[in-house]
Amino acid sequence: MTQHVTAARPAAIRTRPGWRVWNLAALTALTAYSTGVAWQAQFVSYPLYRAMSAAEFPGYHLAYNAAIPGVVIIPGFLSFLACAAFPFARPAGASRTAAVVVAVTGIGSLLSTVLWAIPMHDRLDAIGQDPATIASLLGANAVRTACLTLATLALSWCTVRLIGRGQVSS
């Protein structure tokens, strides 16, 4: 009787999701959110920079920058950094290749933001509306959007595979 109970326990433990599975689920949701924000910026927010008058642009850009920390900056940087660390936190059933893809896209998103997009925003603050700077900002965001999209696809694929294997049931 004792052996039967002991033998049944490991099977029950194996089917219970651990922190790595919950981390995957949370990272997938966070990265999907950041991906949506990036697509919105690419096709709505940043193109509207061109539609403003030069006189109205500085005030608008300052207001935009003040409005985005909680909905864009914090989730974005959390996503970039968590993606970069994903190979160290991936669940056992998640592909190593997918984990590397997620990490590379996290690093790519971080670098395109810090080394390219932020300097373009700073330049817009300094010189005002400038078509070349807006075009460069769109380029930086295109890289970030592509990286985030690829990360979301890879994370979603990992999640679907784990669900298909029954490794996410509680």
Question: In which residue ranges do the predicted regions lie?
Answer:
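Interfacial loop at the N-terminal end of multi-pass membrane proteins
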Residues: 3-13, 17-74, 119-136
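Transmembrane helix-loop junctions and nearby membrane-interface residues
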Residues: 38-42, 84-94, 114-121, 156-166
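Short, charged juxtamembrane terminal tails flanking transmembrane helices
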Residues: 2-7, 163-170
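Core segments of transmembrane alpha-helices
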Residues: 75-85, 145-153
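Interfacial segments of alpha-helical transmembrane regions
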Residues: 17-32, 85, 89-107
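Mid-bilayer segments of alpha-helical transmembrane spans in multi-pass integral membrane proteins
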Residues: 107-115
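Alpha-helical transmembrane segments of multi-pass integral membrane proteins
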Residues: 128-157
